[in-house]
Every structure is written in C-alpha cells, then in structure tokens.
Amino acid sequence: MNHLIILVVAAVFLGMASAEDVFHKRFTVSCLCASDGPSVHGNKLTGTVAVGGCNPGWHKCNTEHNVLYECCKKN
C-alpha cells in the first residue's frame, strides 16, 4: 500500500512539472535583450518577459526600467 501511495505522489509531481514547462513554452512573450542588437529587424528576440521581476536562474538582460515587468534571459 505504501508503494502505491509513493507511486501516485511521484506521478502527480512529474505531471505538475511537465504542465509548468508546457505553460512556459506556450504563454511567453519575447523581448529584446541588450545583446540582441539595436533593433528587432532581423534580430532574434532572446529575452522573455517576466511579470514582477526575473525568476531564480534568470537575469535582467536590458537596461530599461519597468515597474510591472522585466526582460529576462536564462543564465
């Protein structure tokens, strides 16, 4: 019985982790990092908009100061 509970908890945990990855891939907005160049024409937007600030493991990648969001790039 204990093995079954552990198996169910592990399956739920793995399901939540993969659901978070899917959400991040589908619902992200790209932004222009300082390393992308002076304009968006022909350049890839390598940053991701993060509401309220960059998440752990990410860093702010431009020089703009916004109250609601930051342009972040994964370390």
UniProtKB/Swiss-Prot annotation:
Q: Indicate yes or no for the key word Transcription.
A: no
Q: Which UniProt keywords apply?
A: Disulfide bond, Nematocyst, Secreted, Signal, Toxin
Q: Give this protein's Gene Ontology molecular function annotations.
A: toxin activity
Signal sequence extent:
1-19
Q: Which positions form S-S bridges?
A: 31-71, 33-61, 54-72
As for PTM, the annotation reads: Contains 3 disulfide bonds.
Propeptide found at 20-26
Keyword check for Chaperone:
no
**Highest taxon of the lineage:** Eukaryota
Task: Report the GO terms under cellular component.
Answer: extracellular region; nematocyst
Q: Where in the cell is it found?
A: Secreted; Nematocyst
Taking the first listed entry, what is the main subcellular location of this protein, grouped into a coarse class? secreted
Similarity comment: family membership? Belongs to the sea anemone sodium channel inhibitory toxin family. Type I subfamily.
**What task does this protein carry out?**
Toxin that is lethal to crab.
Name of the molecule in the record: U-stichotoxin-Hau3a
Q: What is the lineage of its organism?
A: Eukaryota, Metazoa, Cnidaria, Anthozoa, Hexacorallia
The gene designation is HAUTX4
